[in-house]
């Protein structure tokens, strides 16, 4: 899985060669921003949650945004809990530090937070702790098969 599955995912749009692998780690928002040479906010981080029952939710948000539990509960109608590292790997096929909404092992519901819309391009990971791709918010929505844009974050405005 992981980087290979993400590259395979991007073949649908002939974009597999746009995935960049770095010599240094891009596993955290801070490392990714430094490695790529952009602000923290332009890193599109993917956060994995368990909803009701076996439902898995992936929320992609700007690197400077934090989940607002009240907004999240209002949006989804329940309190979601973050997945453990083992659950993340099992559900997405990606290790923490490389989680992204592409080339997933299963089909979690993918949501994009509006905190990303303020940028012309953002940089989500690509399945490994040292990879990313530059996408417009529109491309991110299309390539991730996201359900809808949501507003569940704080501290970014």
Swiss-Prot record:
- Which Pfam families does this UniProt record tie to the protein? tRNA_edit
Q: Which molecular-function annotation in GO is an example for this chain? A: aminoacyl-tRNA deacylase activity
Q: Which domain of life is it from?
A: Bacteria
InterPro entries, per database record = YbaK/aa-tRNA-synt-asso_dom_sf, YbaK/aa-tRNA-synth-assoc-dom
Task: List the PANTHER family hit by this protein, alphabetically.
Answer: CYTOPLASMIC PROTEIN
What protein does this entry describe?
Uncharacterized protein YwhH
- The protein's organism comes out as Bacillus subtilis (strain 168)
Gene behind this protein: ywhH
């Amino acid at each position: 899985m992981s980087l290979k599955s993400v590259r395979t995912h991007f073949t649908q749009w002939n974009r597999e060669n746009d995935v960049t692998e770095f010599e240094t780690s891009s596993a955290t928002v801070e490392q990714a921003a430094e490695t790529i040479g952009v602000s923290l906010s332009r890193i599109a981080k993917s956060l994995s949650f368990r909803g009701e029952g076996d439902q898995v939710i992936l929320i992609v948000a700007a690197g400077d945004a934090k989940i607002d539990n009240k907004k999240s509960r209002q949006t989804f109608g329940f309190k979601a809990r973050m997945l453990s590292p083992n659950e993340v790997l099992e559900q997405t096929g990606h290790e923490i530090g490389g989680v992204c909404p592409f080339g997933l092992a299963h089909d979690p519901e993918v949501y994009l937070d509006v905190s990303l819309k303020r940028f012309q391009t953002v940089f989500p990971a690509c399945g490994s702790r040292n990879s990313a791709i530059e996408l417009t918010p529109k491309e991110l929505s299309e390539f991730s098969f996201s359900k809808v844009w949501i507003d569940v974050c704080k501290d970014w405005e």
